[in-house]
Amino acid sequence: MAAGVSLVSDLPYSTSRESNTDMETVNVRVPTAKYTKVGETLRHVIPGHMQCSMACGGRACKYENPSRWSDKEQAVKGLYSSWITDHLLAMARPSTEIVEKFNIIEQFHVCGLKTVINLQRPGEHASCGSTLEPESGFTYRPELFMEAGIYFYNFGWKDYGVASLTTILDMVKVMSFAMQEGKIAVHCHAGLGRTGVLIACFLVFTSRMSADQAILFVRAKRPNSIQTRGQLLCVREFAQFLVPLRSVFSCAEPKAHEVTLSQYLTRQRHLLHGYEARHMKNMPKIIHLICRLLLDIAENRQTVEEEVLEIPDLTEEVEKTVSLQALQQLGKEMRGKGIPISSPRSPDQPNLLGTPCDPPHDQPLCSDQEFDVLWRWPTVDNTYRSRLILSKCFSYSDSALHKLDPRVHVLQSPQNLSSKSGLNFSELYASQSRLALETPDLLPSDIKSSPKHDLLTGSRSSLVQSKKIEEQVSCPPASVKQAPLKVAKRSMSYGFLGRTNDSSTMFSICQVGRSTNKNSNCDVTQHFKDVPILTLQSELSPETRHLFVAKALTVDLDGEELRSKVSVWQMELNSREGAWERLCNERDPVVLSLLMWSWLEQLKEPVITKDDVETLSGNRLNPEHALNSLDKGQKQTLLCILDCAAHLLKIPEEVENAFFERLIKAFTWISSDSENGQLIYKALKDVMVPVLRDLRTKAMEELEFTCHCSFVP
């Protein structure tokens, strides 16, 4: 509820608690409460029926009287309502009379509103507007909406109050879930206080706006929203609450406190829900995802695409629904009130994940230069953002699961490091080139003898015809404007979350004479535009691809180039919206493997501690019993990686031994050449080798079964 109250300013709000070199902080005023402190106190002591009479007119409640509001203030005719985004409606509570008189349900269907979220408690504001329905305690019967195919949720939230942070987190996850069905309408009494808080928290959760940015954005769309000091504080505290939960790498910016595997899984459970929450209850998402991506590279999986209805992206809505004039006005207001705003990047500042040439649609506006638009993500293509919700790794509603695979398509990501980062085009695939040169048996003999064979490189982005190579060097494909799709497509590939174009592959062969001198890379780059490119998606045998991935799993983090690429991914996963989706486009198995090992090695303590080593050693004659002695998180994490290696099937013994060396090193932080290192490695291998063989046997049986089924008429 909101009454005619004066606007007052709070004490200056300082963000000195958080120092960020990329943010400007001015210790001046920020969004303030809509009520005075006296007014807030009175609202907690004055009886409800008196508040209704004094504040909003009692039975003649202005919030439930359409004649009190202009057409612009009635996004849905008959209700005091406002579109916050194209898919989020804030509204005053409806009543049975209004629903019937203004045909609200039909309007909802026309607008595409599929969910109603009610934040009231039954019996609340009984002296306001229409009388309460005895069956529900609200001014309407929820069955009116449910019988019309509109979902209904009720989260009881005390008027003028705030909910706990975990409760709000549950609410915004439900909203993320519900938005996949269609648009959402949220209401409390007036649709201002509690409704504004929830929507602001949802913006913070889904688009990584700061708390104050979200508050100002909601107020710009629905004036007088988020009313009390407690509600303002609630949004700010919720934003802070999410910071450690989103941290994947504590060693990368923005840094967070180190956590154990068990603590990380607890944090992960807060953010995940639905399919992911069930499937990764005891397994880190990053381990599960990387193992699946490695198997997709090894199997060179072809994706089977299915047409489904496009799910809207909230981040694109936020940009689209704010005009240039509104952006300028908000930018001035925020600078005037001292809200931290990202400083424009200096010309000489490297942009590790950016592209050297921004597409026309992502060029900064004149207002961006002056005010630095709040919700502009410089490294994410707008077309890519339009599918973030589609591929968002939250979960899918039950009605969508039957037609969707949880692994979905995403567009190409701008992960090619720009020249500003010190890496040129020929260095992009150096890690795979080195690995390939060290493995002469990776290529079939017929390919080795081909005059076109010379340089083996890893292809992560789409390969195009040779005439387009020069354009790729100057402007990576991720920065090219993509035409919006009317239909979104999801990948049915087992385990692959990314998008595999027809021309994309893990390898390419360039017609360049093999050279071992230092200038070979320069020659490759110099002749790229004249070199035809062959894709080896079909030429490479499965055994060759399996061996390539197996060798990638044995690599240590060494060299500035690899460190730079892994570091970029660490920061990306920590701080960027849609980073999980962009990771699915990484096709370099070396980078993926190193990212996985680096995550295990940055935890607060090893996944397998010294006590665990002793327990496993004592049970090494019974590997299954030994694994069961570990916690569920330890066991599932270890089994996930072993299962990935098992699906690579038969690999040379020396490669398998090197894999175990790298695995044990990452899980125990003990080097094989340390004191008692050899004894520890032997004891753990005695447990892991039989487990790997069992998993490999099962993988081969699955493969035989799949092959048999494929030939059944």
Curated annotation (Swiss-Prot):
Residues 80-251 form the Tyrosine-protein phosphatase domain. It is an enzyme of class 3 (hydrolase). One of its GO terms (molecular function) is protein tyrosine phosphatase activity. GO terms for biological process: cilium assembly. Its EC number is 3.1.3.-. Keywords: Cilium biogenesis/degradation, Hydrolase, Protein phosphatase. The active site is at residue 188. The keyword Cell membrane does not apply. One of its GO terms (cellular component) is cytoplasm. The keyword Hydrolase applies. InterPro entries: Dual-sp_phosphatase_cat-dom (IPR000340), Prot-tyrosine_phosphatase-like (IPR029021), PTP (IPR050561), PTPDC1_PTP (IPR049573), Tyr_Pase_AS (IPR016130), Tyr_Pase_cat (IPR003595), Tyr_Pase_dom (IPR000387), TYR_PHOSPHATASE_DUAL_dom (IPR020422). Belongs to the protein-tyrosine phosphatase family. Non-receptor class PTPDC1 subfamily. May play roles in cilia formation and/or maintenance. This is Protein tyrosine phosphatase domain-containing protein 1. The lineage of its organism: Eukaryota, Metazoa, Chordata, Craniata, Vertebrata. The gene is ptpdc1.
